[in-house]
Amino acid sequence: MARLAAFDMDGTLLMPEHHLGRETIATLARLRERDITLTFATGRHVLEMRHILGTLSLDAYLITGNGTRIHSLEGDVLHRQDLDPQVADTVMHHAWDTRASMHVFNDNGWFTGQEIPALLQAHVYSGFRYQVIDIKSIPAHQVTKICFCGDHDDLIRLRIQLNEALEERAHLCFSAVDCLEVLPLGCNKGSALAVLSNHLGLSLADCMAFGDAMNDREMLGSVGRGLIMGNAMPQLIAALPHLSVIGHCGNQAVSHFLTHWLDNPHLPYSPE
């Protein structure tokens, strides 16, 4: 039986309206009763995740910023990784040929250059929001990650530009169809989960993980049991064809799967 369960948030544990369903919360509590350690592995900021965690009355480790930070149950930093300052400087100051908006993250919060109210819908239940500033004024040595939000085809063209400019100095991934992230080299949820597992005296074989986007690929591919959401990006399913696909986040599929796993661990699972 798995001893550590890792959950992506948006498109996985959260429902389409970006909140946790009652069945999901109850199932997470059941995992803790079985002494299974929980970790939420997300692109969201730790400041937001602490607020969300505080509403659940659950102990969980936090992997935030797509692996740039790991926090203990007590809120202590177990691991941190920032963008190379030269990479951050290049990304923030270059005039990219794109219509996508740029968003910069550091330990103090989420920063962008203009008001984009539509982006706040994903954070309506936590109240977390961006701060509008001149992005070029942000110190390059304090940046954890940078992301671009916009049309997918536009982001694909932008990824080509970023790859040419940054070469092998950063990790690029799609955390959603409309979000392209620039992360520290070698930084992803999978590498962070390996650090956390080692800290807990576990191996990745002792872990199960759930996800729906390309920023979950390394995590899902490295654990003992990786589960892909039915609403996942097609690229993720294609990249990990050997993994099982469960139901849709709107149907609380993670809870559905885990309830079966807890109650009938030796029987085959069907998402129906």
From Swiss-Prot:
Cofactor: Mg(2+)
Coiled coil: none
EC number(s) stated in the UniProt entry for this protein: 3.6.1.-
Residues at the catalytic site: D8 (nucleophile)
UniProt cross-references to Pfam families, sorted A to Z: Hydrolase_3
GO molecular function, one term: magnesium ion binding
Keyword set includes Magnesium: yes
Keywords: Hydrolase, Magnesium, Metal-binding
Binding residues for Mg(2+): D8, D10, D212
Domain of life of the source: Bacteria
Database matches in InterPro entries: Cof, HAD-like_sf, HAD-SF_hydro_IIB, HAD_sf, HMP-PP_phosphatase
Reactions mediated catalytically: 4-amino-2-methyl-5-(diphosphooxymethyl)pyrimidine + H2O = 4-amino-2-methyl-5-(phosphooxymethyl)pyrimidine + phosphate + H(+)
Function, as annotated: Catalyzes the hydrolysis of 4-amino-2-methyl-5-hydroxymethylpyrimidine pyrophosphate (HMP-PP) to 4-amino-2-methyl-5-hydroxymethylpyrimidine phosphate (HMP-P).
Entry similarity comment: Belongs to the HAD-like hydrolase superfamily. Cof family.
NCBIfam families registered for this protein in UniProt: Cof-subfamily (TIGR00099), HAD-SF-IIB (TIGR01484), PRK15126.1 (NF011705)
The protein, known as: HMP-PP phosphatase
